[in-house]
A protein has these predicted regions:
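N-terminal secretory signal peptides that target proteins for export/translocation
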Residues: 1-4
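Boundary at the C-terminal end of the N-terminal hydrophobic targeting segment
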Residues: 20-25
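Bacterial N-terminal signal peptides
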Residues: 6-18
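Acidic, Ser/Thr- and Gly/Pro-rich intrinsically disordered linkers and low-complexity segments
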Residues: 31-34
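Structural detector for internal amphipathic alpha-helices that build alpha-solenoid repeat scaffolds
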Residues: 36, 41-55, 64, 72-85, ...
Length: 225
């Protein structure tokens, strides 16, 4: 029994090594498919595989597809899932060469990743009426939910275009939840107050007011170290 127990760590290490080698092989195979003359279905499947096993080496191949239909969404989803910061950088760089639906998708992915480095770019898009993705940029700023990310939300709620105030309110509710989770209760309440003041009475203002009341009653949560 003792001998068997002593083998367990060795077996675990060997098993982990096998898993890593398999992942590397899958990544290499998927990248080879993207570089080949394979069909759309095969390349889409390769993008999906890279979302699971891809690392920094995967990023250039996926980034090159962000403006190419019908693979752009598959490539974007792959980059969205890769944890390495270079994936977020690739998405940010793509903002200047995309428009329409493809631009909106990348904006959304930056929010899902909570890319704080993208806040200046998202702010520009949110406050530019000609960007075509102002609502999407506001939503992503809400998902990021840092103090800096909430500044454009406050701007729109304060004196922004009327058609953007509802999207900004939705984003502010999401951002307030993140601020509260991070222990920034005062900032969360102030942001929710902006929602209450910006809109006529309705479900969004009711939700904001209820959350303000709840935050006043809740003790400050411990901020994760």
């Amino acid at each position: 029994m003792i001998a068997i127990r002593s083998l367990i760590p060795v077996l675990l290490v060997l098993g982990l090594a096998d898993v890593c080698r398999a992942a590397e092989a899958t990544e290499s195979s998927a990248l080879a498919v993207l570089a080949s003359g394979a069909g759309v279905h095969e390349k889409a499947r390769a993008c999906q595989q890279l979302a699971v096993v891809g690392g920094p080496a995967t990023v250039p191949a996926l980034a090159a597809l962000l403006d190419q239909e019908p693979l752009a969404d598959y490539a974007r989803s792959g980059l969205e899932a890769i944890k390495d910061p270079v994936a977020g950088e690739a998405l940010r760089k793509a903002l200047v060469r995309l428009n329409g639906r493809l631009l909106a998708g990348v904006v959304n992915s930056l929010g899902v990743r909570r890319e704080t480095a993208a806040v200046p770019d998202l702010r520009r898009l949110a406050l530019d009426p000609k960007s075509g993705v102002a609502s999407e940029a506001l939503a992503s700023l809400g998902m990021i939910g840092t103090g800096e990310a909430t500044k454009p939300l406050r701007t729109v709620l304060g004196d922004g275009p009327a058609e953007l105030r509802v999207p900004a309110a939705h984003a502010a509710l999401a951002a307030a939840a993140q601020l509260a989770k991070d222990g920034n209760l005062v900032d969360a309440r102030e942001l929710l107050g902006c929602v209450v003041r910006a809109l006529p009475s309705g479900h969004l203002t009711t939700a904001a007011q209820r959350r303000i009341t709840a935050l006043r009653a809740d003790p400050a949560p411990a901020v994760p170290k």
